[in-house]
Amino acid sequence: MTPRRRVAVKQLPLQLKSGQVRDFLRDVTPLLTGDRPCIVFDFSQVTEIDSAGVDMLLHCMEQAMKQNGDLKLAAIPPSSAVILELTRVDRLFEIFATVSEAVDSFYGFSVPIEQPA
């Protein structure tokens, strides 16, 4: 039996803006540089996101993919979901209603939220 890959869940800060993004990137970089990282970003506390936050998400996705890993998003509040939709970033990520669904998806137990056409 193949061992289950470890999934890291990272709570995003209240505001995904330039100052907070730098601090968050410093904390999350070790997770992104490991072999085949499996990461879930928990959006449940996020109240604001700007272009620096969107850029950070794209950077983290790119770094995870370079290591043959994956980054998934979970528990996105409506105000943040609008930003991700307007920037079309929502099309690049698997997005889940809850963190547990996102974690389970790494093991084949869950289905992402349907994105409207």
Language model features by range: what are they?
Residues 4, 48, 60, 101-104:
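Generic signature of intrinsically disordered, low-complexity, basic-rich segments
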Residues 5-14, 42:
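Short, aliphatic-rich beta-strand segments
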